[in-house]
């Protein structure tokens, strides 16, 4: 399933795919404040290939999970977080994760990872790393962002060193979609 705001989702969803160490997190961390400065509220879904722990041993929420709670919602006046324990270890589905987000408070969802899922996405490519391109083997790639000019490219090419250019491209894509 290819996510877009008209057919499957009320808000635009755009993925970023690349090999580990290419700079996906760095790029998204540059794009988000530009969007925010333009009044666009951004949510992010990040795929982790490894175990992670947001909780700390000894804290009440950790103790509740350790005791067997399937979900623990931790809330304060500034933020809240829902810790959910998966009963079955399986790759998460981005569509199911999107259902968990409060889209009434977002204008755009950026997805880091999930490169094999049918999301519209921008490929990050750094030729100096010596890795093969993901396009055309991966579905849904709508543009490529690189730190070097790419020859004979059929997709729109974006400069990784120009985050404002990337924001402009994404805003144009949001309006078309």
Q: What does each model-identified segment do?
A:
Residues 32-89:
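N-terminal phosphate/diphosphate-binding loop that engages ATP/GTP or pyrophosphate donors
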Residues 14, 43-45, 70-73, 122, ...:
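Hydrophobic/aromatic beta-strand patches that form the interior of the parallel beta-sheet core
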Residues 85-114:
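Phosphate-binding/switch loop-helix module in NTP-utilizing enzymes
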Residues 109-111, 121-125, 140-147:
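Short, hydrophobic beta-strand segments that form beta-sheet elements in well-ordered domains
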Residues 116, 137-177:
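Conserved NTP phosphate-binding and transfer environment spanning the P-loop NTPase/kinase superfamily
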Residues 49-50, 79, 115-117, 129, ...:
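Conserved nucleotide-binding/hydrolysis micro-motifs of P-loop NTPases
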Residues 115-137:
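Conserved C-terminal guanine-recognition region of P-loop GTPase G domains, centered on the G4
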Residues 2-50:
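Walker A (P-loop) phosphate-binding motif
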